[in-house]
Amino acid sequence: MKKIICGLFVAFCVAVCLIPSLGMIVRPTTEPVGNERRAKAPDAVKKDGSPNFSYLTELGGYYEKSFAFRPEMITADAAVQAGVFQSSSVDTVITGTDSWLYYTSSADDYLGRNTLSESEINGVIHNLGIIQRYSQAHGARFLFTVAPNKNTLYPDHMPYYYGLRVSDVHNRDLLRQALAGTGIAYCDLFAPLSSQSETLYFRRDSHWNNKGALLAYNEVMNALGKEHDDYSAAEVTRKKDFVGDLSKMVYPRGGEAEYNYYYGAENAYGYVTDTQSVEDTLIKTQNPNAAGTLYMYRDSFGNALVPFFASAYGNASFTKAFPMNVAADLAADKPDTFVMELVERNIGWLITMPPLLPAAETTLFQAPSALGGKAEFTVAPCDYAAEYTAVSGTLSGVTLDSGAEYYLSVNDKVYEAYSLKTEGGDGFLVYLPSDAYPAEAALDIKLIVKNNGEYYEITGGSYED
């Protein structure tokens, strides 16, 4: 009898283990889970007729995302881990209390960990200044704004094991302090959003709801001084139809819909592009009853902003491309307004992937003195736009003031450089026109730094292409 029971138990276990594989015959998982991309079955033979020697590896990857009942199993596992251990089954999501979910990439900001250094914050300000000056020189008013992380505004539902903060210093505060007196147009969204008694972000999504987006939109439009409909008199529709991005990642088969608010803004404009959703990388709109032309960089927080801004401008262009090709977009769209929105957790992008702009040629106010140190240069075709040659590098062997600025002398012409954060430390970057400065050409490059108000030429250097 015991042997029969053991045999039945083994057979049951084998059957359970075979369900995901055999189930693919009748019910494979065809839709991606969360932010994953749709899995495609590999081919044993490549298009050129040669054998695909990576076929088995690719087949394994395909199976991992396509076995039967995968979403249901992920959802069940997530429910157990959240309910019993108050932890997340997905590395990119933090499971909080009362069914709240947070984006893991916001943890550093929440804890005050890995905060940008003073020189890095100054680099962000420096790069914003370059963007604003270029924008204004090409007829577009510039404004920068930051969308708060969800756990910045609503920390009470973060799990207990995030209770020990590393520091009370946060990038948002450092940025706001550094912006003071710079002349850079900045719209603060932290104060108005944090002053609201109502929760304006979704529980199971990392973003604000439409009511929060409307508040942000009105703050930006007021900062621009542009007349607009604030939707205070709009007939608002409340629908329980929104399933959050984090919810889809953690509970692909148990996503709970949340209430969202609709103000009718989406009926005031039409799409110029073949737009499938507000998630699209590039969206262009027209509203014949509005005036002005808007160019807006937005991340995923901008999804809910698109209807409001599209309704307020005659022509609007919304891009998610990063690094954004500001020069090409301004030349093509000729906007009168350029709004740049970044979420708090991505402030550092401004010094890791600054926008594509041709470096401004400049004249130094004094002849630079010599300064020791070693500059390492890299010259290469730009990875994102063929019209540019990228000249980047780092400086070592010398200590600079946290507000130091970089300039590159290339073939005896001086260009203002972006501040750049690299794995090797603080650095610099310029984009030069590739027709005048081809990457394969021998370029005479010198690094000049402005340190404590004085200009210095770095005497040591090496060149790599």
Segments predicted by a language model, with ranges:
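Extracellular glycan-modifying ectodomains
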Residues: 1-465
